[in-house]
Amino acid sequence: MSGYARRQGAPPLSRTRSLVVPDAPAFYERRSCLPQLDCERPHGGDLHPHLFGFRPTFMCYVPSPVLASVGDTGFGYGKGKCTNQGPSGAPETRFGGDKLEDLEEANPFSFKEFLKTKNLSLSKEDTTTSRIYPKEASRHPLGLEHSSPASQLMGYGLESQQPFFEDPTRASNLEEDEDDGWNITYLPSAVDQTHSSRDTQDSPPCDTYLSFFSNSSELACPESLPPWTLSDTDSRISPASPAGSPNADFAAHEESLGDRHLRTLQISYEALKDENSKLRRKLNEVQSFSETQTEMVRTLERKLEAKMIKEESDFHDLESVVQQVEQNLELMTKRAVKAENHVLKLKQEINLLQAQLSNLRRENEALRSGQGASLSVVKQNTDVALQNLHLVMNSAHASIKQLVSGADTLNLVAEILKSIDRISEVKDEVDS
């Protein structure tokens, strides 16, 4: 999944080697060598009816290579912490990260609870038969050590287990059925496939599988487990009965016990299957949420890139505007300098004009002072000019008369010239 780093060389989730359902407080301790998964655990609400009223509390220890394949999810790796972002009020399931008092609650998948359930179911049967045979009583604990969940506690991969005591009777078939039932109960489908594929090859020793969980001192042994309490119905085989042919009572008891055990295993299998489906749904939700967040991040990156491009273009526009403003300021500065120079020139011209104006004022005052003395001279000049004009007029009249008389003479000469042309023409006609 994009957006999260995956560890190199991590195998797929289907290669999960073991799922431990602990029944002792030692298995509730945190182990620094093992990664733990903390998921949500129900703190309230109605309990599922198929869990017999018990609250499902179990703990998964998964090898680190297997957990690395789930690195894309939102679960905490290696620290046993996880923050689920589910809706408020939803039921939660926690794996291995609860407090000690929460982990010490009743575990329906533990060996103790299995013993209690089996003792309660066996006590309700017919108590009239009270035959106890030492051979059968000694066989049951030994067979239990082989087929009990304590052996399953070591992990799914413990296929090299050998019983401490093998009875040639048909009870061994019952123990094999119980082993098969436990394998079906605690093995998911993906682990079953890997489990069956490893059967065809050389299986590593049990110590390699036990190293995934803890040292051998921490593993639950038959001495640390509560003893198997046999009821009246647990030993119905007569000592005189042959080893290969148990009586009808034991066959009926075996059948009822197997059916009851099968129902219990089916219920636990369904519970684990539901829990597996819930975890898968949560994983799908986390993956979808991660994809949504990745798409949102990509959208935000695109928006941020577009915004950065827009800001860059705005920055370039602002730079051009600033440059233009600087050019305008320089031009205005030049214009201001020119205006100052022009003002200086105008001031100088004003000073010159003021000087000329003062001179003209002085001349005007002088003329006004000398105007009274020059009036008599002006009158004399005007009289002389009038006399001269009269003389010119008289001479002009005389010349005009002469011109008129000269014009009359010119008209007479023109008439004479015209008559000369006529006289010549008449003479020519007479000659012809």
Curated annotation (Swiss-Prot):
**Segments for region (Required for interaction with PTPN13):** 174-196
Per the record, the GO terms for biological process are:
cell division; cell projection organization; endocytic recycling; positive regulation of cilium assembly; positive regulation of protein localization to cilium; protein transport; regulation of cytokinesis
Which residue windows does the record flag with biased composition (Basic and acidic residues)?
A: 126-143
Extract one GO cellular component term from the record. recycling endosome
Q: Where is it localised?
A: Cytoplasm; Early endosome; Endosome; Recycling endosome
Q: What is known about what this protein does?
A: May be involved in modulation of TNF response. May be involved in presentation of TNFRSF1A on the cell surface. Involved in the endosome-to-plasma membrane trafficking and recycling of SNX27-retromer-dependent cargo proteins, such as GLUT1. Involved in the regulation of cytokinesis; the function may involve PTPN13 and GIT1. Endosome-associated protein that plays a role in membrane receptor sorting, cytokinesis and ciliogenesis. Involved in the endosome-to-plasma membrane trafficking and recycling of SNX27-retromer-dependent cargo proteins, such as GLUT1. Involved in the regulation of cytokinesis; the function may involve PTPN13 and GIT1. Plays a role in the formation of cilia. Involved in cargo protein localization, such as PKD2, at primary cilia. Involved in the presentation of the tumor necrosis factor (TNF) receptor TNFRSF1A on the cell surface, and hence in the modulation of the TNF-induced apoptosis.
Report the sequence similarity comment from the record. Answer: Belongs to the ENTR1 family.
Instruction: Kindly state the subunit structure of this protein.
Output: Found in a complex with ENTR1, PTPN13 and GIT1. Interacts with PTPN13 (via the FERM domain). Interacts (via N-terminus) with GIT1 (via N- and C-terminus); this interaction is direct. Interacts with NOD2. Interacts (via N-terminus) with IFT88. Interacts with VPS35.
Q: Could you give the domain comment from the record? A: Tne N-terminal domain is necessary and sufficient for basal body localization and ciliogenesis.
Output this protein's name.
Endosome-associated-trafficking regulator 1
